[in-house]
């Protein structure tokens, strides 16, 4: 329960690889589940919905594309994910997305960056 003056931004975590099988979804399942939750919770008092691919390591290009589609369909929603927490993570991420110029570029390519984007960590960023 939210107290007066409080707000919450939350969303279903989307992961379709590199995670325990019991928490994996598919790109379509993540899209469908998120869309249903957006319909249920968007604009409900102080609650805001965040489209939430966990991070690029646990999302295939297909899942990030569907998350980007959700962001385009629902521009009032936030997008929340992780970015550049440590150097090993960055190396692994860039090995999965070799076309990206840096970690942030992955999210940009899939339409996940905008004024409502929330990036957890963002410690080791590449100067541009």
Predicted regions, residues:
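Metal-coordinating catalytic core of metallo-dependent amide/deamination hydrolases
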Residues: 2-123
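Short, intrinsically disordered, charge-balanced linker/junction segments flanking boundaries
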Residues: 126-128
């Amino acid at each position: 329960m939210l107290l007066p003056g409080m707000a919450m931004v939350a969303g279903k975590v989307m992961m379709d690889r590199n995670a325990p099988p019991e928490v994996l979804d598919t790109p379509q399942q993540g899209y469908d589940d998120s869309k249903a939750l957006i319909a249920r919770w968007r604009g409900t008092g102080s609650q805001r919905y965040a489209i939430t691919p966990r991070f690029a390591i646990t999302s295939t290009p297909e899942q990030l594309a569907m998350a980007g589609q959700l962001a385009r369909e629902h521009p009032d929603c936030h997008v929340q994910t992780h970015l550049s927490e440590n150097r090993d993570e960055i190396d692994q991420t860039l090995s999965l997305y070799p076309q990206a110029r840096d970690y942030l570029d992955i999210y940009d390519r899939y339409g996940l960056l905008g004024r409502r984007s929330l990036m957890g960590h963002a410690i080791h960023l590449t100067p541009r």
